[in-house]
Amino acid sequence: MMATPNQTACNAESPVALEEAKTSGAPGSPQTPPERHDSGGSLPLTPRMESHSEDEDLAGAVGGLGWNSRSPRTQSPGGCSAEAVLARKKHRRRPSKRKRHWRPYLELSWAEKQQRDERQSQRASRVREEMFAKGQPVAPYNTTQFLMNDRDPEEPNLDVPHGISHPGSSGESEAGDSDGRGRAHGEFQRKDFSETYERFHTESLQGRSKQELVRDYLELEKRLSQAEEETRRLQQLQACTGQQSCRQVEELAAEVQRLRTENQRLRQENQMWNREGCRCDEEPGT
């Protein structure tokens, strides 16, 4: 800080002259307290220095609220106020770098759906245990699993016709009902198996790569050609067998016709011999 001309003049005077000037003042003038000076000839406090000390006190008060008064952010060379310091010191939130890759439930595979349901069930059980330990009312876990557990495996299928019941016989009606339930149960099992197999087959195909799908397609074409060759061979064999069977049938039919003709001839001869025998018996008696 640069010294003013008044301060330079005060430094030029000796301490003895300053004391004499203070004691030899006007008799009516008020007595001013003597100013303190150090032995090194330091300058007295100026209004600028006093204002700077007040800013330091204000900065210290702000530091008592949790701010560091000696940090370069809270104390500037120009002597900033507390409002400016507080306005400058703001916490800016940044977006989280961790991104959650969320997928819809319908796009998940069967294994991923089971894993998500298992995690949700474990989390719900843990929360319910914590609430029960704190004495809070606990509601049952909101899930549809109880519907699957309570589903009747013998649920009748409305598309399958039931047996006609006769009101006159109770035993026959019970037998018809049990038979209808058995058919409905079998139809339900076949339908459930086909749906499960189709879902599993679709998921397995979705999990394969393009090269694997091409290799499977070529393998299926090879099996199809083998099956077609086997079908043609069986058809030819069946045709040959059919021709042989037709020939045998024709031979047997001809043999049957021959035997019928022979039988008819023998019957006629037998009748003729019977007539001749009767004629011979009548002649000796006459």
Curated annotation (Swiss-Prot):
Homooligomer and heterooligomer with HEXIM1; probably dimeric. Core component of the 7SK RNP complex, at least composed of 7SK RNA, LARP7, MEPCE, HEXIM1 (or HEXIM2) and P-TEFb (composed of CDK9 and CCNT1/cyclin-T1). Interacts with CCNT2. The gene is HEXIM2. Residues 113-132, 178-195 have a biased composition (Basic and acidic residues). Its main location: nucleus. Transcriptional regulator which functions as a general RNA polymerase II transcription inhibitor. Core component of the 7SK RNP complex: in cooperation with 7SK snRNA sequesters P-TEFb in a large inactive 7SK snRNP complex preventing RNA polymerase II phosphorylation and subsequent transcriptional elongation. The modification Phosphoserine is found at S29, S39, S51, S53, S71, S76, S81. One of its GO terms (molecular function) is identical protein binding. This is Protein HEXIM2. Ubiquitously expressed with higher expression in testis. HEXIM1 and HEXIM2 are differentially expressed. Belongs to the HEXIM family. The modification Phosphothreonine is found at T32, T46.
